């Protein structure tokens, strides 16, 4: 049995076939149009998202000869409001990166309601407030809801709990919409889709050739975790534009909806029947974006960043702190800014590249340290995926700094693999135990440094991070 995986990321839509052994074949990709009409605003075209998802899926289906089931994974918290009568969006899709509702969040916090601008809650209200006519026909959609609606040709209006739990609009156990929050935001409960499990038959995807059954809806980070065979335990870090860690906790719901002292959140990563699986989540705001920026300056080629870093034996005293848009976990200082330290006339692009990759690796270890402070268990092996996972120098440096084996996913985009495997579990063809055996590891990087050397480097790193904090005091004083 084979699954079609549809993966809507922040800048592209991907599709592929995933088989019961976890092999990913017949991949197709199309770029999304991302607009930023004003500083801090990030929009996508809802119609384009649906059209491209179906188009790339059809390309995969034509090449592969068809599939049995479909799994969908997507960037979380990106928000759409649409007219249920026509299936058309009433405005742009507001990306999870969109910050236009920052002031709304601060105003609501003063009234006792804590919401963050990267959640869906205030984005929904912003979109609804810009509708002047009758609103009873409006419906809210995260991207899983939007794709399920279009793949089923309007028959399915649902959302899964891994997507719902990052909207800011559900109860702590992610079992139902929080009517108190909806009331506070003056949002009609009829706008919101029924909450469903991540894995399980939902209905035919009639917009696709053969009408395969839609059997999984899952947020991107949960799909990445699942795609790397982290089922009942395990920790992964996805190093993409930013970096996101997830470390499985178990089935006990969180005690709070808010940011923990460690700078992590607790989020749902899978739900089946009465059981929801939870994980700690930590975020680095700038990771691969730093490598891309360095290349755009003409100082090094993105694809050759590993070779450039390895062309010199040391950083020659140069240190880089990646904080283009602030520091996430554990600091959450939006006013921090990125910086190079220790520059001299002898500093070359190779020294800077090496320092840059070192800095991103350090930030990854900051995430692991946060899990430890929260009482979580990282384990002896950390799994990694995402664009930076193909950089062997970076992966080795991450292993050296964290003192653990680092298992690199054979699939750079483990989200695609995870959504397909989730669909095969949803239809009953695979069990969770089966998936746990499908590690899909390309290679393992083993740490080379002593405990004393790691400790010394980590102490020096923390000192440099502190020097970047509070660069823009007004932003550093903001918290959500």
Where are these regions (language model features)?
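Short beta-strand-loop/turn "lid" adjacent to the catalytic site in phosphate-handling enzymes
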Residues: 62-95, 116-118, 148-171, 196, ...
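A conserved helix-loop-beta module that forms one wall/lid of the active-site cleft
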Residues: 182-200
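N-terminal glycine/serine-rich phosphate-binding loop of ATP-dependent small-molecule kinases
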Residues: 1-90, 136-137, 193-194, 209-216, ...
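Carbohydrate-associated surface elements
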Residues: 98
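Active-site donor-binding loop signature of nucleotide-sugar glycosyltransferases
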Residues: 30-32, 197, 270, 447
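Short loop/turn motifs at secondary-structure junctions
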Residues: 66, 188-191, 361, 378
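Short glycine/proline- and charge-enriched loop/turn segments
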Residues: 32-36, 160-163, 439
């Amino acid at each position: 049995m084979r699954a079609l995986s549809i993966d809507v990321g922040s800048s592209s839509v991907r599709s592929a076939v995933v088989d019961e052994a976890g092999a990913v074949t017949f991949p197709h990709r199309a770029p999304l149009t991302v607009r930023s009409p004003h500083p801090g605003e990030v929009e996508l075209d809802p119609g384009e998202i649906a059209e491209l998802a179906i188009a790339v899926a059809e390309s995969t289906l034509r090449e592969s000869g068809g599939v049995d089931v479909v799994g969908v994974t997507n960037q979380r918290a990106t928000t759409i409001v649409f007219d249920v009568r026509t299936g058309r969006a009433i405005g742009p899709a507001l990306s999870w990166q969109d910050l236009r509702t920052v002031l709304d969040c601060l105003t609501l916090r003063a009234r006792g309601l804590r919401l963050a601008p990267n959640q869906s809650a205030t984005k929904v209200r912003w979109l609804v407030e810009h509708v002047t006519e009758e609103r009873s026909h409006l419906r809210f959609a995260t991207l899983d809801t939007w794709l399920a609606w279009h793949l089923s040709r309007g028959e399915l209006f649902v959302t899964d709990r891994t997507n719902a739990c990052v909207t800011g609009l559900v109860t702590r156990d992610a079992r139902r919409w929080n009517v108190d929050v909806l009331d506070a935001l003056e949002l009609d409960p009829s706008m919101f889709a029924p909450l469903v499990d991540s894995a399980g038959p939902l209905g035919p995807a009639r917009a696709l050739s053969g009408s395969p059954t839609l059997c999984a809806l899952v947020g991107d980070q949960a799909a990445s975790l699942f795609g790397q065979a982290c089922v009942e335990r395990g920790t992964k870090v996805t190093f993409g534009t930013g970096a996101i860690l997830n470390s499985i906790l178990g089935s006990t719901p969180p005690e709070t909806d808010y940011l923990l002292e460690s700078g992590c959140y607790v989020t749902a990563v899978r739900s089946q029947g009465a059981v929801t699986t939870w994980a700690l989540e930590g975020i680095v705001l700038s990771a691969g974006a730093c490598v891309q920026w360095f290349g755009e300056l003409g100082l090094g080629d993105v694809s050759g960043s590993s070779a450039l870093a390895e062309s010199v034996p040391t950083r020659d005293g140069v240190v880089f702190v990646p904080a283009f848009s602030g520091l996430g976990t554990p600091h959450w200082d939006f006013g921090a800014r990125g910086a190079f330290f220790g520059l001299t006339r002898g500093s070359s692009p190779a020294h800077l590249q090496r320092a840059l990759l070192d800095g991103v690796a350090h930030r990854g270890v900051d995430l692991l340290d946060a899990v430890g402070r929260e009482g979580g268990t990282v384990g002896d092996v950390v799994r990694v995926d995402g664009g930076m996972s193909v950089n062997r120098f970076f992966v080795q440096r991450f292993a050296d700094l964290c003192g653990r084996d680092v298992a690199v996913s054979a699939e750079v985009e483990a989200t695609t693999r995870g959504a397909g495997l989730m669909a095969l579990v949803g239809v009953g063809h695979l069990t969770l135990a089966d998936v746990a055996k499908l590690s899909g590891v390309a290679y393992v990087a083993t740490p080379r440094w002593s405990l004393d050397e790691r400790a010394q480097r980590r102490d020096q790193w923390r000192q440099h991070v502190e020097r970047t904090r509070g660069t823009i005091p007004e932003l550093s004083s903001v918290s959500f």
